[in-house]
Swiss-Prot record:
Catalytic activity, reaction form: an N(4)-(oligosaccharide-(1->3)-[oligosaccharide-(1->6)]-beta-D-Man-(1->4)-beta-D-GlcNAc-(1->4)-alpha-D-GlcNAc)-L-asparaginyl-[protein] + H2O = an oligosaccharide-(1->3)-[oligosaccharide-(1->6)]-beta-D-Man-(1->4)-D-GlcNAc + N(4)-(N-acetyl-beta-D-glucosaminyl)-L-asparaginyl-[protein]
GO molecular function, one term: mannosyl-glycoprotein endo-beta-N-acetylglucosaminidase activity
Highest classification ranks of the organism: Eukaryota, Metazoa, Chordata, Craniata, Vertebrata
Keyword Cytoplasm in annotation: yes
Pfam families listed in its UniProt record: C1q, Glyco_hydro_85
Protein name: Cytosolic endo-beta-N-acetylglucosaminidase
Length: 728
């Protein structure tokens, strides 16, 4: 059917319905005192957003069907999926497409301290799980029970998604989660076996134009999908002609990636020698140094001994932090240590001032099983923490509900909004908390209860005799500037047993300032204690500028208590936010405690008065009708797209207000899912089948969730109304 457009001048009170019929029927435009209708040939209706009733509205009467490209959508459900490229032909044929926009990372790379370019030894994490692209390929998440999740980002400097496909494009959920924590993400370009030799002959032995075309495409792919570079792994022998162009290829690829991706990286895997022979060296030496010199780093194979580290450190010189010594957690081959002995390998690597590359951390999940995975995962990383320097958050606002990207239900304001298992790493939130080493104190993920998302943070332990308190801190490194800064902090807590024996309070730590003013007292740090400690003021009543935030600060909601605080600071660097657990009364005995931390927000109070943006231009496309689960129902899948200022939303909640065939009050909105970009594919919506001559309507809503998690009024949501009827 030919696409048509109709332009209507709308008055404020007008409501527009667009109805498309399948079969032969004359186009008609008519109106009555209630509605304006535009009727076309076709199948379904596209309703322009109710949020923009003024001005000119363009309505497109194009018939849409299910999305076709199997690369970007699951063939059974039409859900958007992440993908890889197989072979040189697919790589060179790749080009950006509107169908692959779901695969574009929506989260910019956050700043952290110390930055990646600091010279301290780093930690690279290389994910290798059963060939890759498992449940993590479903961009909008899946109903997976007991999935593999990674959430110890504070220990990691670089993340690599590895598979044995020629071009591994990291699933966007991993890039979103890593970027939120300030961790750059690399894809993998790999060639192996006889097919790999043929591929390398085609683009390396073929001359400068051939390898430049490959490097250009790899840089374009990283730029388009917004990840940060490549691990290059040539696992096959090369001819003299091919190996002669390998270093120029790496240099050109590195330059292309640096030009296309801010902070981009290219890392070479220890495999090929300068002669073209495939022989893993387990060190940096003169036979593989030429490739190290051509890019940003070397990932050393994992069958090394301490003498390899000594020679590597000497040869690397000032670039010692660019050498990542491989550690296979599965302990394959002759290795120093893997599994729960991985710390033995890291101890030697750090002894020589080198970076580490931890390969296949999924050992915890695959070897020990799904049961007690979170407990075993925390144990694994806890054994390594002495050798893994951590990082601090550098920007505000900071808001986290401590979701690990999975759950047994979805919670909102302490109430379970949707029951059932879910898995989506894009929905993972920051977990930057570290216990102080006084008393016994532990943190763990609680899936049974949450304030928002899928989990909360369980904090439990004992205050030992002779101590008044224990603390858990959130590490920050935020320069507040000399002009002054008003911090607003909101915490949500649920107390457990012995709740009358302890109290919970907040403390701010400032650093590196000759004069730090907290609004009432100027703190002058001494040489012995170059920091100030501040106790934020509890806000009993909402000042006008904070009323939206304090609307959520109440007592007793589903067993949770929310409190908001304010602190004026000037000329400071904000370094830590600590949760202090103190005795209610002095006691010579230890005091046990347990509580759930549901949410923590640190906001710039001065920025909260601004009105949030509005969701604009909400449209529907790629519609696919099927028979429903019963004779009275249809099943509808469609893609929603909208506009919203970049960086202004943490995510979007996509809701349905229900489908109805009679004029009735709309139902309560039901959550369909979360979107982390400005598009969402609703799959398998059960809607009523209209009777002959009857029309039904479905209303869909898009609610922006701000980085501050301040509420956004419904008048700024996106709204779309679909009106449909049986074909004539």
């Amino acid at each position: 059917m030919q696409s048509q457009s109709v332009m209507l001048e709308l008055r404020e009170q007008d409501e527009v319905w667009v109805r498309l019929y399948k079969g032969e029927r004359e186009n008609a435009v008519f109106s009555d005192e209630y509605d304006t209708y535009i009727t076309f040939s076709g199948h379904l209706i596209n309703f322009q957003p109710a949020a923009e009733p003024l001005g000119t509205t363009v309505l497109h009467a194009a018939v849409d069907t299910r999305p076709q490209p199997a690369r970007y959508f699951d063939t059974g459900t039409t859900e958007p999926v992440s993908f890889f490229l197989s072979g040189l032909e697919e790589l060179l044929a790749w080009h950006p497409s509107s169908d692959d926009e779901f695969n574009v990372c929506a989260v910019p790379l956050a700043q952290r301290q110390p930055p990646l370019h600091s010279r301290r030894p780093r930690t690279l994490l290389c994910h290798d799980m059963r060939g890759g692209y498992l449940e993590d390929r479903f961009i909008q998440g899946s109903a997976t029970r007991n999935p593999y999740v990674f959430y110890h980002w504070r220990y990691v400097d670089i993340f690599v998604y590895f598979s044995h496909h020629t071009v591994t494009i990291p699933p966007v959920c991993w890039t979103n989660a890593a970027h939120r924590n300030g961790v750059p993400v690399l894809g993998t370009f790999i060639t192996e076996w006889a097919d790999g030799e043929k591929l390398c002959e085609a683009f390396l032995a073929g001359g400068e134009d051939a390898y430049r075309a490959v490097s250009h495409q790899l840089a374009r792919i990283a730029q388009h999908y917004r990840f940060d570079g490549w691990l290059i792994n040539i696992e096959n022998a090369l001819s003299a002609a091919a190996v002669g162009n390998l270093s120029p290829f790496l240099r050109h690829l590195t330059a292309e990636v640096h030009g296309a991706v801010p902070g981009g990286l290219v890392i070479w895997y220890d495999s090929i020698l300068e002669s073209g022979t495939l022989r893993w060296q387990n060190e940096l030496n003169q036979q593989n140094r030429v490739f190290f010199d051509a890019c940003d780093g070397l990932f050393v194979n994992y069958n090394w001994k301490e003498e390899h580290l000594e020679r590597t450190r000497e040869l690397a010189g000032q670039r010692h932090a660019d050498v990542y010594i491989g550690v296979d957690v599965f302990a394959r081959g002759d290795v120093v240590g893997g599994g729960f002995d991985t710390n033995k390998s890291l101890s030697l690597i750090r002894k020589h001032g080198l970076s580490a590359a931890i390969f296949a951390p999924g050992w915890v999940y695959k070897h020990l099983g799904e049961e007690n995975f979170l407990l075993n995962e925390d144990k694994f990383w806890g054994l390594l923490e002495d050798y893994l320097p951590t990082h601090s958050i550098c920007t505000l606002p900071l808001a986290t509900s401590f979701s690990v990207g999975m759950g047994t239900g979805m919670f909102l304001a302490g109430k379970e909004e949707e029951a059932g298992p879910w898995y989506n790493l894009s929905a993972q939130e920051i977990q930057p908390l570290y216990p102080e080493r006084r008393g016994w104190l532990s943190t763990s993920c609680c899936l049974q209860d949450a304030w928002c998302g899928g989990s909360s943070l369980r904090v439990q332990g004992t205050i030992p005799p002779g101590e008044e308190r224990v603390a858990i801190r959130l590490s920050l490194w935020v320069d507040l500037g000399s002009s002054g800064f008003s911090l607003s902090i909101c915490g949500t807590l649920a107390s457990g047993p012995h709740r009358d024996d302890f109290t919970v309070a907040l403390e701010l730590t400032t650093w590196h300032s000759s004069r730090c003013h907290d609004g009432t007292v100027t703190v002058l740090p001494s040489e012995d204690e170059p920091h100030g400690r501040h106790h934020p003021h509890l806000l009993p009543a909402p000042p006008p500028a904070l009323s939206r935030m304090l609307a959520a600060c109440s007592h007793g909601a589903q067993g949770w208590t929310s409190r908001c605080y304010e602190q004026e600071l000037r000329g400071c660097s904000l370094r830590d936010l600590s949760l202090l657990v103190s005795r209610q009364q002095a006691s010579p005995q230890e005091t046990s405690f347990s509580c759930l931390l549901g949410e923590l927000r640190v906001l710039d109070a001065g920025s909260m008065a601004a009105s949030p943006p509005q969701v604009q231009s909400l449209t529907a496309s790629q519609l696919w009708w099927q028979d429903g689960p019963s004779a009275e129902q249809l099943s509808l899948s469609l893609t929603l797209r909208w506009a919203f200022p970049p960086g202004r939303a943490a995510c979007f909640r996509v809701l349905s207000q229900g489908a109805r065939c009679h004029r009735a009050q709309p139902a309560q909105p039901q959550l369909l899912g979360l979107a982390h970009g400005c598009q969402y594919r609703a799959v398998g919506l059960a809607v009523p089948r209209p009777a002959p001559g009857q029309s039904c309507q479905l209303e869909l809503l898009v609610e922006p969730v701000l980085p501050s998690e301040l509420p956004v009024g419904p008048e700024r949501w996106g709204r779309l109304l679909l009106v449909y009827s049986e074909p004539a």
